[in-house]
């Protein structure tokens, strides 16, 4: 894990964490597609990974998904966390969600194998609300957003291990998002080699839904 983080830092030397097709897109999504690099310490990243590993190991990697959005993945939802992990997740909630936003009670955990990827998709409003926030563990990756009506408008987020990304508003509903497969994993001219990636994702409640669980499977975030 530490090796992946050092590699990402070498790749990113002198680079921003977000790049886009033009200044208008960067300005439009400045507060709606956000990356906080180094949100987790190495110790916190290790804490989350150790807690998740036993539950993830019981599942096989899958190569199709109920909505065909993910390849090479295993996933789970987790409601019970250790005290140390609860402190971390509370920091995520404070950083990403407003005081008037309610969150889905289970946290979505998605484990991509090194060859795994998430295809371009727009999350259904039935499954989560206007904001999602994800912690990236183990491997650097590149998330790409593309406007659904004007595909020449795009944004790329560089997600190193220990980073937090936040998507809200227009970035959620007007842009598709994906995690690039290894052979396409570039951030500008910088190659970002993919390894196994775990994301820990908090989601706001869908509009008009009370506290609890979504009625259908979670989105591929």
From Swiss-Prot:
GO biological process: DNA damage response; fatty acid metabolic process; regulation of lipid storage; regulation of mitochondrial membrane permeability involved in programmed necrotic cell death
Binding-site residues, Fe cation: 121, 123, 177
Subcellular location, record wording: Mitochondrion matrix
EC number: 1.14.11.-
InterPro entries the UniProt entry points to: AlkB-like (IPR027450), AlkB-like_sf (IPR037151), ALKBH7-like (IPR032870)
Main subcellular location: mitochondrion
GO cellular component terms attached to this protein's record: mitochondrial matrix; mitochondrion
Recorded superkingdom: Eukaryota
Tissue and organ expression note: Widely expressed.
Knocked-out gene: effects: Increased body weight and body fat, a phenotype amplified under high-fat diet.
Cofactors that this protein relies on: Fe(2+)
Cofactor comment: Binds 1 Fe(2+) ion per subunit.
Transit peptide feature, positions: 1-23
Residues engaged in binding 2-oxoglutarate: 165, 197-199, 203
Molecular functions per Gene Ontology: dioxygenase activity; metal ion binding
Keywords assigned: Dioxygenase, Iron, Metal-binding, Mitochondrion, Necrosis, Oxidoreductase, Transit peptide
Role this protein plays: May function as protein hydroxylase; can catalyze auto-hydroxylation at Leu-110 (in vitro), but this activity may be due to the absence of the true substrate. Required to induce programmed necrosis in response to DNA damage caused by cytotoxic alkylating agents. Acts by triggering the collapse of mitochondrial membrane potential and loss of mitochondrial function that leads to energy depletion and cell death. ALKBH7-mediated necrosis is probably required to prevent the accumulation of cells with DNA damage. Does not display DNA demethylase activity. Involved in fatty acid metabolism.
PANTHER family for this protein: ALPHA-KETOGLUTARATE-DEPENDENT DIOXYGENASE ALKB HOMOLOG 7, MITOCHONDRIAL, SPERMATOGENESIS ASSOCIATED 11-RELATED
Similarity remark: Belongs to the alkB family.
Name used for this protein in its record: Alpha-ketoglutarate-dependent dioxygenase alkB homolog 7, mitochondrial
Organism from which the protein derives: Mus musculus (Mouse)
Name of the gene: Alkbh7
């Amino acid at each position: 894990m530490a090796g992946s983080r050092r590699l990402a830092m070498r790749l990113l030397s002198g680079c921003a964490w977000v790049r886009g097709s033009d200044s208008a897109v960067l300005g439009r999504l400045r507060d709606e597609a956000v990356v906080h690099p180094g949100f987790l310490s190495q110790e916190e990243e290790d804490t989350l990974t150790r807690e998740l590993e036993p539950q993830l190991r019981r599942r096989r990697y899958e190569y199709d998904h109920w909505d065909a959005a993910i390849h090479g993945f295993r996933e789970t939802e987790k409601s019970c966390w250790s005290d140390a992990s609860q402190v971390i997740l509370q920091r995520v909630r404070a950083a990403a969600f407003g005081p008037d936003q309610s969150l889905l009670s289970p946290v979505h955990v998605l484990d991509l194998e090194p060859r795994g990827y998430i295809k371009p998709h727009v999350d259904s409003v039935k499954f989560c609300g206007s904001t999602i926030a994800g912690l990236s563990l183990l491997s650097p990756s590149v998330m790409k957003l593309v406007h659904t009506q004007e595909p020449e408008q795009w944004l790329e987020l560089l997600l190193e291990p220990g980073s937090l990304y936040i998507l809200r508003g227009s970035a959620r509903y007007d842009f598709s998002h994906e995690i690039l497969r290894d052979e396409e994993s570039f951030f500008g001219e910088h190659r970002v080699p993919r390894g196994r990636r775990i994301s820990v994702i908090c989601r706001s409640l869908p509009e008009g839904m009370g506290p609890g669980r979504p009625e259908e499977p979670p989105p591929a975030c």
